[in-house]
């Protein structure tokens, strides 16, 4: 198992993992607000990777036997004018995507990915890390509470 920075040769596997993540979210979405748009697979990875690049972020991949089994994406959080009016706005990293393939969960891969992203955020002076998790994502909430 190794954690590496994203390389373009893994784009198709990243697309597959993001679809797996969205399918999971759809399966637990109590409000039925999520959807898997026909263009999701082809566009979401590109949009996520552009966001990472534009916002001083990183994408790390967990590789096992030359197969991508997990990924994490994170960026430097941006603030708008409203934020500055009522918030101190510390330098903050934001985890935007985290998925470990269902076949390889419960092996510590998610923690390895989080640790790698935490190292990166610390290296660029972030004081905090944020992540948004749907309230109905009990597995995700449980994972982050352990971190």
Features from the language model and the residues they span:
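A short beta-loop-alpha structural element at the N-terminal edge
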Residues: 2-28
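Conserved GNAT-fold acetyl-CoA-binding loop/helix
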Residues: 23-47
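A short helix-loop-beta-strand connector motif used in the catalytic cores of GNAT acetyltransferases and
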Residues: 46-61, 94
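Conserved beta-strand in the GNAT
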Residues: 61, 67-76, 94, 99
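Conserved acetyl-CoA binding element of GNAT-fold acetyltransferases
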Residues: 83-102, 132
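Conserved acetyl-CoA-binding loop-helix of GNAT-fold acetyltransferases
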Residues: 97-100, 106-119, 145-146
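Conserved active-site alpha-helix within GNAT-family acetyltransferase domains
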Residues: 111, 123, 135-147
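Conserved GNAT acetyl-CoA-binding A-motif
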Residues: 114, 121-132
């Amino acid at each position: 198992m190794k954690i590496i920075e994203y390389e373009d040769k893994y784009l198709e596997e990243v697309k597959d993992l993001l679809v797996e993540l969205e399918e999971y979210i759809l399966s637990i979405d109590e409000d039925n607000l999520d959807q898997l748009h026909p263009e999701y697979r082809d566009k979401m990875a590109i949009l996520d990777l552009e966001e990472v690049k534009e916002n001083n972020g990183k994408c790390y991949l967990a590789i096992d036997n030359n197969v991508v089994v997990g990924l994490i994406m994170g960026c430097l959080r941006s603030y708008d004018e409203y934020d500055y009016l009522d918030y101190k706005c510390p330098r903050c990293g934001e985890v935007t995507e985290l998925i470990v393939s269902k076949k390889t969960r419960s092996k510590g891969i998610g923690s390895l990915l989080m640790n790698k992203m935490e190292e990166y955020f610390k290296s660029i002076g972030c004081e905090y890390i944020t992540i948004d998790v749907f309230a109905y994502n009990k597995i995700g909430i449980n994972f982050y509470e352990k971190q």
